[in-house]
Design a protein with these regions (language model features):
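Short secondary-structure transition/capping segments
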Residues: 16-17, 164-168, 210-214
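Alpha-helical scaffold segments in soluble metabolic enzymes
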Residues: 58-65, 93, 142-146, 174, ...
């Protein structure tokens, strides 16, 4: 028999009897400490990395145990703790701690030392009217052309990744001068067509009505005999020979 169990802190160790919820797992797994802005408190992400992340780790463990049973003929218990799962998802920050020898600080939406790699305001300035843009070295010149700043191509202040880090405030400012005049999906379309990785910050309503997600069957409208019509998230895993 292969069987699985999930606990907040597992069945062994000093915290094994402690109760846990999603935010508790994020706090104890290190996720909260690296989420949010530098001058604000540690922040919970409501992407459910503790709940859903633990479940996905558990499924992987079950599949591994089933594969092993095929060769050994023996079953076993699969155990995943919520704290362990969050720690695994925070492994990049743990790596950075080893690299720099100190706790990783909250950095808002800035992605590491990439510049640009941040959120930029868009028209008309609503709570979620932002687009996230990241451009590595080979994307820098196309980005400048798109935002109508070809005059900066070759400018030594921004020519290398290291130089852009030193002038990050200036870079972010002239990118936002362009994005703030455009709706987030318009900005995303223009940038994406130029090969610049980007994404509009979509609220839940926009996600539910996203034409791409609907085309892929990720957002589905269902009819229930007693509840009526409602919308759900579909299956993110696509199998070529199975309709799941």
């Amino acid at each position: 028999i292969v069987y699985a169990s999930i606990k907040g802190f597992g069945s062994s160790g000093p915290y094994s009897a402690f109760k846990s919820f999603e935010p508790v797992a994020q706090a104890m797994g290190g996720s909260m400490s690296v989420t949010g802005f530098p001058d604000n408190p540690p922040t919970v992400t409501w992407s459910c990395v503790g709940d859903s992340g633990t479940g996905m780790h558990c499924v992987i463990g079950i599949l591994a145990a089933l594969m092993q049973r095929n060769t050994s003929g023996e079953g076993q218990q699969v155990e995943v703790s919520m704290q362990d799962a969050v720690v695994n998802l925070v492994r990049v920050s743990l790596r950075d701690h080893q690299r720099y020898g100190k706790p990783v600080e909250r950095n808002g939406n800035q992605l590491g030392s990439f510049v640009p790699a941040n959120t930029y305001r868009c028209h008309p300035g609503g709570a979620n009217d932002y687009v996230f843009i990241i451009a590595q070295q080979q994307m820098w010149e196309p980005l400048l052309r798109v935002i109508e700043r070809a005059d900066l191509i070759g400018d030594v202040r921004y020519q290398t990744a290291e130089a852009r880090v030193e002038h990050a405030d200036e870079v972010n400012a002239f990118i936002e001068e362009w994005t703030v005049k455009r709706a987030k999906h318009e900005a995303m379309q223009i940038l994406a067509e130029a090969g610049v990785p980007c994404g509009a910050c979509q609220d839940t309503s926009e996600v539910l009505n996203d034409p791409h997600l609907r085309a892929r069957g990720m957002i589905l409208d269902l009819d229930h005999p007693t509840r009526g019509s409602y919308t759900i998230a579909g299956n993110p895993i696509k199998l070529s020979a199975s309709n799941v």
